[in-house]
């Protein structure tokens, strides 16, 4: 259940109550594709840096180790030793982005595994069953992610199919939640708005799925190559047509400036691989924007990554030392930078929540964008 606590302009401060705890929103979800953050970061680390929600990937976990294995181990929470909320995506994005050979039919999608090439089928019911086996807190509906740009006629047909799939997802989840051997029989379902960059298709789809009384609503199919202006235009078009008493999730968006702009438009949930991926390559976020620690100017820099930061890396190590670790190809380098970036993101969201609580979010946003100077 979502409770709106405060608004600052269109920015929303809320609480989302789940079977695994209350999520303070706006929130950034840390992406652990295979039930782990790439960069040697553990679930204990995530708690220490203030992570509220972990996101795992249905497609990848279905292939390895297999959702049946996870179910036999008691579900994702026990499997990865994490007692806070977990969101699993439906696998739809990976089916359409990773699989070179796929066939879309009304019942679902036939595709080839990106690991060994074997033929696999996934549809709404299969996605729900896999996510039920994983026993995540929040399951995402199975949808079709169209390429961007795509012909209008195809997008219209795709959105209609995604709506039919959403009804099937809801029916199947209700069935699964009623079974005696279901680990989490209070699993929640978020629907996904699609429609490419066509505002009218997006709006009509938002109105349609808003009537389904789901636990939350996501805006999908963005951050896939369109301009930031197009992204903001679609968010502006869609958000007013989604229920105000449900959380709104902007899928796959994680550039800090994009997060600020989306919060300013009423978005509550975010996720992205960016902080971990950048950290693994020595790109770290600071109050003054993103920097590359491999640059020669940091060789003798005795400052922490970001002065004033309370993450484990900044409290104990210098830029010079971490740069040396990267040059020496030590795994500790990746770990420290991933920890720092994840802390930066979770701290950013805490500052955003405080700014909305204090009704100064607009001023906060403008100050941060000026400080970053287009570098974040």
From Swiss-Prot:
Cofactor(s) the record lists: Zn(2+)
Broadest EC class assigned to this enzyme: transferase
GTP-binding as UniProt keyword: no
Active-site residues (renumbered): 89 (proton acceptor), 271 (nucleophile)
Cofactor note: Binds 1 zinc ion per subunit.
Pfam families: TGT
Residues involved in substrate binding: 89-93, 143, 194, 221
Disulphide linkage map: none
Residues that bind Zn(2+): 309, 311, 314, 340
Catalytic activity: 7-aminomethyl-7-carbaguanine + guanosine(34) in tRNA = 7-aminomethyl-7-carbaguanosine(34) in tRNA + guanine
EC nos: 2.4.2.29
Region of interest: RNA binding: 252-258, 276-280
Pathway(s) served: tRNA modification; tRNA-queuosine biosynthesis
Key words of the record: Glycosyltransferase, Metal-binding, Queuosine biosynthesis, Transferase, tRNA processing, Zinc
GO molecular function: metal ion binding; tRNA-guanosine(34) queuine transglycosylase activity
GO CC annotation: cytoplasm; cytosol
GO biological process, any: tRNA-guanine transglycosylation
Role: Catalyzes the base-exchange of a guanine (G) residue with the queuine precursor 7-aminomethyl-7-deazaguanine (PreQ1) at position 34 (anticodon wobble position) in tRNAs with GU(N) anticodons (tRNA-Asp, -Asn, -His and -Tyr). Catalysis occurs through a double-displacement mechanism. The nucleophile active site attacks the C1' of nucleotide 34 to detach the guanine base from the RNA, forming a covalent enzyme-RNA intermediate. The proton acceptor active site deprotonates the incoming PreQ1, allowing a nucleophilic attack on the C1' of the ribose to form the product.
Subunit structure: Homodimer. Within each dimer, one monomer is responsible for RNA recognition and catalysis, while the other monomer binds to the replacement base PreQ1.
Family recorded in the similarity comment: Belongs to the queuine tRNA-ribosyltransferase family.
Protein's recorded name: Queuine tRNA-ribosyltransferase
UniProt source species: Clostridium botulinum (strain Hall / ATCC 3502 / NCTC 13319 / Type A)
Underlying gene: tgt
């Amino acid at each position: 259940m979502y409770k709106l606590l405060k608004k600052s302009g269109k920015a929303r401060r809320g609480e989302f109550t789940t079977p695994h705890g209350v999520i303070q929103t706006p929130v950034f979800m840390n992406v652990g594709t295979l039930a782990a953050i790439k960069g040697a970061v553990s679930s204990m680390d995530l708690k220490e840096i203030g992570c509220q929600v972990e996101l795992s990937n249905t497609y990848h976990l279905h292939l390895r180790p297999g959702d049946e294995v996870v179910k036999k181990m008691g579900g994702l929470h026990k499997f990865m030793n994490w007692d806070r909320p977990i969101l699993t995506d439906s696998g739809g994005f990976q089916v359409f982005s990773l699989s070179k050979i796929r066939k879309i039919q009304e019942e679902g999608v036939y595709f080839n595994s990106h690991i060994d090439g074997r033929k696999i089928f996934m549809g709404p019911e299969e996605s729900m069953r896999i996510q039920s086996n994983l026993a995540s807190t929040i399951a995402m509906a199975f949808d079709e992610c169209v390429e961007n740009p795509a012909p209008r006629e195809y997008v219209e047909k795709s959105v209609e199919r995604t709506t039919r799939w959403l009804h099937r997802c809801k029916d199947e989840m209700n069935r699964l939640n009623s079974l005696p051997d279901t680990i989490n029989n209070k699993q929640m379902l978020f629907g996904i708005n699609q429609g490419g960059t066509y505002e009218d298709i997006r709006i009509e789809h938002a109105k349609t799925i808003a009537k389904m009384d789901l636990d939350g609503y996501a805006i999908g199919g963005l951050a896939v190559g369109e301009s930031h202006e197009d992204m903001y235009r679609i968010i502006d078009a869609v958000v007013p047509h989604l229920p105000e008493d449900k959380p709104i999730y902007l899928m796959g968006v994680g550039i800090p400036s994009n997060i600020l702009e989306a919060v300013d438009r009423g978005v509550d949930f975010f996720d992205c691989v960016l902080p971990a991926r950048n950290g693994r390559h020595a790109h770290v976020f600071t109050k003054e924007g993103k920097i590359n620690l491999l640059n020669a100017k940091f060789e003798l820099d005795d400052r922490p990554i970001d002065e004033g930061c309370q993450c484990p890396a900044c409290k104990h190590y210098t830029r010079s030392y971490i740069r040396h670790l990267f040059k020496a190809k030590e795994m500790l380098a990746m770990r420290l930078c991933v920890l720092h970036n994840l802390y930066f993101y979770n701290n950013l969201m805490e500052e955003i929540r405080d700014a909305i609580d204090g009704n100064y979010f607009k001023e906060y946003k403008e100050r941060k964008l000026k400080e970053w100077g287009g570098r974040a």
